[in-house]
């Protein structure tokens, strides 16, 4: 039996970690989720990003969590402002989601759609299925992302029964 060199062993471990990461991303593509645009505004400026990693934590007090990639263009602005609005998208918002999910400059992102504000001042998409206006209460390290624990301070609920979903790397309507 031959002994493996330390370099070869390290290369195999790296490849294994890379493969595990790829396998995980492929598996997560099979987990359907609502599409949201998360926005912020305040002293650090206005920014927003598309997110599917959003879920309820508690109803007393009303609390949501959002996962924010540390490499996202909105990362520093969101963290500095300390407020967000989670806007859950309707079926007709696919183009808007694409704008907020890519490299489009913030000004162009917000030029699309009609925006208002609630208590925190974070942009509220006027025709979102629901908008959760939040203050960021805590942030936790989650690897490549921060896990933001957010207290809901106001909500806007609109009529509509077709949600924009993301499943298997494609938009779907539910």
Swiss-Prot record:
Q: Report whether Flavoprotein shows up as a keyword of the record.
A: yes
Keyword annotations for this protein, in alphabetical order, are: Flavoprotein, FMN, NAD, Oxidoreductase
Query: Gene encoding it?
Result: rutF
As recorded in UniProt, its EC number(s) are 1.5.1.42
GO BP field: nitrogen utilization; uracil catabolic process
Task: Say what the protein does.
Answer: Catalyzes the reduction of FMN to FMNH2 which is used to reduce pyrimidine by RutA via the Rut pathway.
Q: Recorded GO terms, molecular function?
A: FMN binding; FMN reductase (NADH) activity; FMN reductase [NAD(P)H] activity; riboflavin reductase (NADPH) activity
Q: Which domain of life is it from?
A: Bacteria
Q: Which organism is it from?
A: Agrobacterium fabrum (strain C58 / ATCC 33970) (Agrobacterium tumefaciens (strain C58))
Q: Which reaction does it catalyse?
A: FMNH2 + NAD(+) = FMN + NADH + 2 H(+)
Would you identify the family this protein belongs to, as annotated?
Belongs to the non-flavoprotein flavin reductase family. RutF subfamily.
Which InterPro entries does the record match to this protein? Flavin_Rdtase-like_dom (IPR002563), NADH-dep_flavin_reductase (IPR050268), RutF (IPR019917), Split_barrel_FMN-bd (IPR012349)
**Name by which UniProt lists this protein:** FMN reductase (NADH) RutF
Which HAMAP family is this protein grouped with? RutF
